[in-house]
């Protein structure tokens, strides 16, 4: 009877130990399942972050392509502006050449007028000399008269030439006035061109600033893409690590479930032994 009691106590102790082990295994299984759920949640979060990173990367690429397109358009505009500036410079150079030619023609006309005036003065002086000589020497009157006629003819010729020179001078003055008008128009055009050049210069400065900003944005996009690539790589590594950890915990859960199943089987066997023992004692 004492042996049976000892056996029952031993079986009860073994039963209690089995129950404790089963509870421990269940708690460990719950903890493992909780950690597995937490890791699965982290994996889902990482997958969401990974998707967001891919979206951000696509957006960054689109913005980079847009910046490149804007930069190309600005470069085309800059080329067209430089071509327009070169055309305006050629026009200014042509106006300056026309002005120089007008000044040369004006100088030539003034020189011819001076020569004609000097010739007329010389003829008048000769006439005075001939008149004085006619008073002093009557014998030479005819000669002087002829000379006077010749002088008058020369004077008339000089007057004719003077009239022609005057007409030419008037024509030259008209040309000079036209040239001055062209000069004034050219100066006005030059002022307009200077204003246009200022506007073009400001546009060029604005384009340079825009290009610098575009380059800065490109560099920022590159740095951001590099950062996103690093984050993506880190996320992939974390996801891979999490998957490995999930697999390891799943194996641990499977092992604990197997252990729990074995403990339950042992507990069931002990209960069966106890029931059988009680049945034997009762039957005894």
From Swiss-Prot:
Tropomyosin, in association with the troponin complex, plays a central role in the calcium dependent regulation of muscle contraction. May also regulate motor systems required to maintain nuclear integrity and apico-basal polarity during embryogenesis. This is Tropomyosin-2. Disruption phenotype: Pre-cellular embryos exhibit abnormal nuclear divisions with frequent loss of chromosome fragments. During cellularization, apico-basal polarity is also disrupted. SUPFAM superfamilies: Tropomyosin. It holds the Pfam family Tropomyosin. One of its GO terms (biological process) is actin filament organization. Belongs to the tropomyosin family. It comes from Drosophila melanogaster. Residues 82-110 are annotated as: Disordered. GO terms for cellular component: actin filament. PROSITE patterns: TROPOMYOSIN. The molecule is in a coiled coil structure that is formed by 2 polypeptide chains. The sequence exhibits a prominent seven-residues periodicity. Homodimer. Gene3D superfamilies: 1.20.5.170, 1.20.5.340. GO terms for molecular function: actin filament binding. Residues 1-284 form a coiled coil. PANTHER family: TROPOMYOSIN. Keywords: Coiled coil, Muscle protein, Repeat.
